[in-house]
């Protein structure tokens, strides 16, 4: 959070962030939207975990890429859950909205669990209702 932003970031909020340059990364640095995925309990830490968004929809769709069509985004964007990263809160520039749709939030959780090889369990930010969601069957 910069000096003009006093608000603590919450899970599933969409922020504009200044992403740092990362050597050997396919992710573009600079100002771009991200989805905060850190839990509320970590509010006092100097960093948050984020998933970067891209407007490039022409790349091959992966199970860890979630399409978000959200009124807070000027174009449909893909959440790159395979590029989850820690980010210093000072790099968060401005809150632009949040992931409103429960299905999109579920899809983000599922993609993160898939990428991190975690079971989709209540301890991973899922509610009991999510456990019985039709997408979780099988």
What are these regions (language model features)?
Residues 1-4:
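Short alpha-helix capping/helix-loop boundary micro-motifs
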Residues 7, 70-138:
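C-terminal terminal-subdomain/extension
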Residues 25-70:
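Compact nucleic-acid interaction/catalytic patches
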